[in-house]
Swiss-Prot record:
The keyword Mitochondrion does not apply. It comes from Arabidopsis thaliana. Its main location: nucleus. One of its GO terms (molecular function) is DNA binding. CDD domains: B3_DNA. Residues 144-154 have a biased composition (Basic and acidic residues). The gene is REM22. It is found in: Nucleus. Coiled coil: none annotated. InterPro entries: B3_DNA-bd (IPR003340), DNA-bd_pseudobarrel_sf (IPR015300), Plant_B3_domain (IPR050655). PANTHER family: B3 DOMAIN-CONTAINING, B3 DOMAIN-CONTAINING PROTEIN REM22. This is B3 domain-containing protein REM22.
Length: 276
């Protein structure tokens, strides 16, 4: 009886995830409303409460927004979702968007031209920019360095706390196995690295006690440590740096790979060495 109940719950969860994982939206100028209607039919996603704030990422341009999700009855919207996307994606004609949703708090989408159905692709030199709604959010140029943000006792509050970080995202994206995976550069002088809290929050990441590290030589395991202040550290990266003979001027990037795609649980970290 208990086994049948567990199977039923698993089936319901998978069904919910299947309906929201991928969907499409069409924008027509002067006809489409500012709020974006989402194919979610209740205030819960995969059995979890609807997140108030979500991250929306354009694969076509690199733009990133923090948006508010709201429910009206059984209908769910991204507040001003179309308004923000149309403005920042320079939309003047009808477009077709293909979305992927992780079921927790991150949306990715690609833009297709409505007439030709050609997929928009960004130049490798374009920067990722997070679009924010208030002073409580932080404007970020990319994930190259989060040191200034991580060490700040609190985010937002004044313009002095806002940060624009220089980017080398064109180099990073060229080396990733999947450009949609979260990634971050590593300080090669340390034996452990802090996984950026912004990355953890945006992708709703969770970690096992031990994680697989994969480089060009093979695989090994390293321990994940969570401090009392909730900071997440990956230990034992010094040996990875040494065995890959990383030279001064090179850059090391960790690409986080999750179970079954974008479901939050990190099971493997791919090591990428970017030569100077």
């Amino acid at each position: 009886m208990e086994e049948n109940s567990s199977k039923k719950k698993l089936s319901e969860t998978m069904s919910i995830q299947d309906t929201v994982l991928k969907f499409f939206r069409v924008y027509i100028p002067n006809q489409t409303a500012d709020d974006m209607n989402l194919p979610l039919v209740s205030d819960k996603i995969s059995g979890k409460p609807l997140p108030r704030k979500v991250t929306v990422k354009s694969v076509s341009s690199g733009n990133i927004w923090r948006m508010e999700m709201k429910a009206n009855g059984n209908t769910v919207f991204l507040r001003d979702g179309w308004k923000k996307i149309v403005k920042d994606e320079n939309v003047t004609e009808p477009i077709f968007l293909e979305f992927e949703f992780d079921g927790y708090g991150v949306f990715h989408f690609c833009v297709y031209e409505y007439g030709s159905m050609c997929k928009r692709m960004r130049s490798p030199m374009e920067k990722e920019v997070i679009k924010v709604d208030s002073e409580e959010d932080v404007l970020v140029g990319n994930e190259e360095s989060t040191k200034g943000l991580e060490e700040s006792p609190r985010r937002g509050g004044t313009s002095r706390r806002r940060a624009k970080l220089k980017t080398k995202s064109h180099k990073i994206y060229e080396h990733l196995d999947n450009k949609l995976n979260p990634s971050f550069p590593v300080d090669m002088t340390q034996n452990r690295t802090r996984i950026p809290s912004l990355l953890i929050k945006d992708y709703n990441l969770t970690f096992p006690n031990m994680v697989i590290m994969r480089d060009k030589i093979g695989i090994l395991k390293r321990r994940i440590v969570i401090w009392k202040n909730r900071s997440v550290y990956l230990n034992g990266i010094g040996s990875i740096i040494r065995r890959n003979h990383v030279k001064p001027g090179n850059e090391v990037v960790f690409e986080l790979k999750m179970v079954n795609g974008y479901h939050g649980l990190v099971h493997e970290i791919k090591v990428h060495i970017i030569k100077a």
